[in-house]
C-alpha cells in the first residue's frame, strides 16, 4: 500500500491548505462542485485531436450526455471513461483535458460519460448510467468511431 503522495499532488494539496481551502469532504455538494470547477478552469487545455463530438447515449433514464474523443480516423478500440468525483462532483468539461490526454496516450477513441450525480440522483442512478454506457459501447462501438 502506498503511503506517500506524488510530489506534484502534494504541491497542489499544500497550496490549497495554504489558501485556507477546506477539505472537499467538508463542503456541501454545490460548494464542492464550484471548487472542482474552479480547479478544472486552471488546467491547461489538452492536446488537439482528430475529432471531439458530443453525443447522447440511450439509457434507462432517457438520454445520457457523452463526449467522444478520437485521436485518429482509425483508432483501434474504444475506452469508456467515467470521470472522478465520488459520484457527486465532476462533469464532461471538467475532465476534458485528462480525457484528451488518455485518447492520445492510448491511441483509442474515448467516450466520456456524463452520468447522473448525487444527491440529486440517488443510488443506483450513477451505477445504472455507467452500466448503460458500457452496454452501449459494447453494442454500438462502431457509432463512436
Which role fits each region the language model picked out?
Residues 115-117:
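Active-site loop/turn elements of alpha/beta-hydrolase fold enzymes
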Residues 121-142:
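Alpha/beta-hydrolase active-site loop
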Residues 76-86:
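Short beta-strand element of the alpha/beta-hydrolase
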Residues 1-68:
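A glycine/proline-hinged amphipathic helix-loop "lid/cap" segment
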Residues 74-75, 89-94:
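Conserved AMP-binding/adenylate-forming
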Residues 92-113, 128:
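Short amphipathic alpha-helix adjacent to the substrate-entry channel of hydrolases
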Amino acid at each position: 500500500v502506498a503511503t506517500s503522495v506524488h510530489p506534484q499532488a502534494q504541491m497542489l494539496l499544500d497550496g490549497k491548505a495554504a489558501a485556507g481551502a477546506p477539505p472537499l469532504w467538508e463542503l456541501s455538494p454545490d460548494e464542492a462542485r464550484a471548487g472542482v470547477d474552479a480547479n478544472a478552469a486552471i488546467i491547461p487545455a489538452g492536446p488537439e485531436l482528430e475529432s471531439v463530438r458530443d453525443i447522447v447515449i440511450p439509457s434507462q433514464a432517457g438520454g445520457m450526455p457523452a463526449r467522444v474523443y478520437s485521436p485518429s480516423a482509425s483508432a483501434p478500440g474504444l475506452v469508456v471513461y467515467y470521470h472522478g468525483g465520488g459520484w457527486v462532483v465532476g462533469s464532461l468539461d471538467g475532465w476534458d483535458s485528462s480525457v484528451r490526454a488518455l485518447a492520445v496516450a492510448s491511441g483509442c477513441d474515448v467516450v466520456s460519460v456524463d452520468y447522473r450525480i448525487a444527491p440529486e440522483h440517488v443510488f443506483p442512478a450513477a451505477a445504472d448510467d455507467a452500466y448503460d454506457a458500457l452496454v452501449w459501447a459494447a453494442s454500438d462501438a462502431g457509432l463512436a468511431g
